[in-house]
């Protein structure tokens, strides 16, 4: 029987005893004879009653034969007169109250119960399992022994360099002497920085699973709560516990909640978070050398962290965790798919090529959506068709096949998307067009998907201008074929203007203004984002900027117009094909652009897309066989592997796999690269126009 059970039984026994005493005290003494009131009156009239004793509620008395009796007093106003008439002795006296000790119990027992309950909760809070009164105690969880994390380094894919640095940190704690012998100082802190979903917290969990030392984990929001001074107290308690368990690792997730830059702002010059940060700074820089406590932290907003928190001596290392490349995405897909049954035709390398810019969280969600899709179709294995549907769902949302649109609106969307596709297909420096659809998905009325041939981090001026021309191709197509323009191009115009403005004001790509950056951003640290831009240029420069934006947009618009006018027949063919089939994949677009007719519609668009993926996989396998054949005939295997891999990538790109999400690519590459996937929104999509920023 544990301590809690013993205390509960003791308090229960005390309560039962007290209740029993009260019942005993309030129990009425039993009378020898209990009469009804009418019987009592009959005996009075018969002269059988000798005397009565009238109390507050009862009438007690004695009959002439010596028998005692009791009856209830109903409050009869004529009772006294009746008793006098029949010469019954009457004794009327004040009702005695309860004894003094009973009254004492009435006041003492509630007070005693309150004290007992108070001490009970105090005992529970001091036992470590609860935090009822320990507001200043740290909420960090200790992972060691059976409570150690099950995540290991082999469960983290696509972050080889990041894992190497963290393995070194773990080795510092496991074998510190070999580093100390060389005069090396154990790092005091490691800061994991990167976009959301790239695996920073997962890396922390992997360190907890691999480290042979205690591991404390806590969130940045767990420090500051309702009471003043709680945050600093919890920081002190956390590091006191860490020192008792040294060597150990302390992991603070989302440290920007407590480590935001200090200074006067919307929150005032000094607040609870600032006091907590000051205590954290003192604790991190107050260690003895080689004490064996390493602080790990993760954040996706390193730009708002206090500079004193990031300096060497506190966070000696900053590890940037970016979105994975092609190889990393394939490894991540393998990790998430290893416990899921896949069909034989599933090629994760094809899926990885279709998802540039996806983070680890995106890929995990993709595989999970594919599993849900397969279960919905009552399948026991996941195939390429399910993965294709999952990619479309993650990128563009759920198909709105039930949405009813008029033929005129359908024609507007068809010509609009055909304009995007043709301009993007014909201009030499754009990404290949992989899918065009006029089926509404999510908030989009139709979309054109363009997949880059390789992971990109930089864009040239020519590529940006052609990107703008592709965005404007939808509006130009509406104007050429329908002699009318619609609100469907609103998001295209906004994005095109944004690209041109960035080219002029941030990238220095204007011929007239030259290689300069205009308009410095203001950062409000207590808001955690940039809410204003300094106008550090004159009105003449502002006029020149507006004029340059107009000229570049007009030039791109004219380029798109000339491209479509020269291929007006192809615009008509693709638009009609979209009206008929609703979705065109890369192979079908290529056939139409080459003047060929499409085969009859025999299967649904999902099956056509799946067939395209299977053909691509077969092409990849065929090239892999050719690679093995060529390896047998050449002496230099390494050179042959490199050449075959290049050919494999080139063939896959020529096959033009289906789409990828430009919006995801923008988020994971650089904030301004809103260039890989074009999704055109209707007038309903104004609320989603900032998705690509």
From Swiss-Prot:
Which residues lie in Acidic residues bias regions? 644-666
What cofactor does its activity depend on? Answer: Zn(2+)
For this protein's source organism, the top of the classification is:
Bacteria, Bacillati, Bacillota, Clostridia, Natranaerobiales
Here the segments flagged for biased composition (Basic and acidic residues) are 680-693
For the biological process aspect of GO, one term held by this record is: proteolysis
The record places the active site at: 417
The EC number(s) this enzyme carries? 3.4.24.-
HAMAP family referenced in this protein's UniProt entry, alphabetically: FtsH
The organism is Natranaerobius thermophilus (strain ATCC BAA-1301 / DSM 18059 / JW/NM-WN-LF)
Question: Could you list which ranges are Cytoplasmic topological domains?
Answer: 1-7, 122-693
Sorted alphabetically, which keywords does the UniProt record give?
Answer: ATP-binding, Cell membrane, Hydrolase, Membrane, Metal-binding, Metalloprotease, Nucleotide-binding, Protease, Transmembrane, Transmembrane helix, Zinc
Q: List where in the cell it is found.
A: Cell membrane
- The broad enzyme category this protein falls into is hydrolase
Q: Which residues bind Zn(2+)?
A: 416, 420, 492
Name this polypeptide is given: ATP-dependent zinc metalloprotease FtsH
Which residue windows are transmembrane per the record? 8-28, 101-121
Membrane topology of the entry? Multi-pass membrane protein
Topological domains on the Extracellular side lie at 29-100
């Amino acid at each position: 029987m544990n301590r809690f059970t013993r205390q509960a039984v003791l308090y229960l026994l005390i309560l039962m005893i007290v209740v029993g005493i009260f019942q005993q005290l309030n129990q009425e003494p039993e009378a020898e004879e209990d009469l009804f009131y009418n019987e009592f009156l009959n005996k009075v009239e018969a002269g059988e009653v000798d005397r009565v004793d009238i109390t507050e509620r009862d009438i007690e008395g004695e009959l002439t034969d010596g028998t005692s009796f009791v009856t209830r007093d109903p409050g009869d106003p004529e009772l006294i007169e009746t008793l006098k008439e029949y010469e019954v002795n009457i004794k009327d006296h004040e009702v005695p109250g309860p004894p003094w000790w009973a009254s004492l119990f009435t006041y003492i027992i509630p007070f005693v119960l309150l004290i007992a309950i108070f001490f009970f909760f105090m005992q529970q809070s001091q036992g470590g399992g609860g935090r009822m009164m320990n507001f200043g105690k740290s909420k960090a969880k200790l992972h060691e022994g059976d409570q150690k994390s099950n995540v290991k380094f082999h469960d983290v894919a696509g972050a080889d360099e990041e894992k190497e640095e963290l393995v070194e940190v773990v080795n510092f704690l496991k074998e510190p002497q070999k580093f100390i012998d060389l005069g090396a100082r154990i790092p005091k802190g490691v800061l994991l920085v990167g976009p959301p979903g790239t695996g920073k917290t997962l890396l922390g969990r992997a360190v907890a699973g691999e480290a042979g030392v205690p591991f404390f984990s806590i969130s940045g929001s767990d420090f500051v709560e309702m009471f003043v001074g709680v945050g600093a107290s919890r920081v002190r308690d956390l590091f006191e516990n860490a020192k008792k368990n040294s060597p150990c690792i302390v992991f603070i997730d989302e440290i920007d909640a407590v480590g935001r830059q200090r200074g006067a702002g919307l929150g005032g010059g000094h607040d609870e978070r600032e006091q907590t940060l000051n205590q954290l700074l003192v604790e991190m820089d107050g260690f003895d050398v080689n004490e064996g406590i390493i602080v790990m932290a993760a954040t996706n907003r390193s730009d708002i962290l206090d500079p004193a928190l990031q300096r060497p001596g506190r966070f000696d290392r900053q590890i940037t965790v970016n979105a994975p490349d092609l190889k990393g995405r394939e490894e991540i897909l393998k990790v998430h798919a290893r416990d899921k049954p896949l069909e034989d035709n599933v090629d994760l390398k094809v899926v990885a090529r279709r998802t540039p810019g996806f983070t680890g969280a995106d890929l995990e969600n993709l595989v999970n959506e594919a599993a849900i899709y397969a279960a919905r179709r009552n399948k026991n294995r996941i195939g390429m068709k399910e993965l294709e549907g999952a990619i479309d769902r993650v990128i563009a949302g759920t198909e709105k096949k039930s949405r009813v649109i008029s033929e005129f609106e359908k024609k507007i969307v068809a010509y609009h998307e055909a304009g995007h596709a043709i301009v993007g297909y014909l201009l030499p420096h754009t990404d290949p067009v992989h899918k065009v659809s006029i089926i509404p998905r999510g908030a989009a009325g139709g979309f054109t998907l363009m997949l880059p041939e390789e992971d990109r981090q930089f864009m040239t001026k020519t590529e940006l201008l052609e990107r703008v021309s592709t965005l404007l191709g939808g509006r130009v197509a509406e104007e050429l074929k329908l002699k009318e323009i619609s609100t469907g191009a609103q998001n295209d115009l906004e994005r095109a203007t944004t690209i041109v403005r960035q080219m002029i004001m941030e990238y220095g790509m204007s011929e007239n203004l030259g290689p300069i950056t205009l308009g410095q951003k203001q950062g409000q640290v207590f808001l955690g984002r940039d809410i204003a831009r300094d106008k550090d240029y004159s009105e003449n420069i502002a006029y020149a900027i507006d004029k340059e934006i107009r000229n570049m947009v007009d030039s791109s618009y004219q380029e798109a117009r000339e491209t479509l006018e020269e291929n007006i027949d192809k615009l008509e063919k693709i638009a009609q094909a979209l009206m008929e089939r609703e979705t065109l994949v890369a192979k079908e677009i290529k056939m139409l652009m080459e003047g060929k007719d499409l085969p009859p519609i025999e299967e649904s668009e999902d099956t056509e897309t799946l067939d395209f993926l299977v053909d691509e996989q077969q092409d990849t396998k065929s090239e892999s066989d050719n690679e093995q054949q060529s390896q047998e005939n050449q002496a230099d295997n390494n050179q042959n592997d490199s050449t075959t891999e290049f050919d494999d990538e080139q063939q896959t790109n020529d096959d033009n796999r289906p789409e990828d999400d430009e919006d995801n690519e923008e988020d994971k590459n650089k904030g301004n690269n809103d260039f890989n996937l074009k999704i055109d929104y209707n007038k309903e999509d104004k609320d989603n126009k900032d998705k690509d920023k």
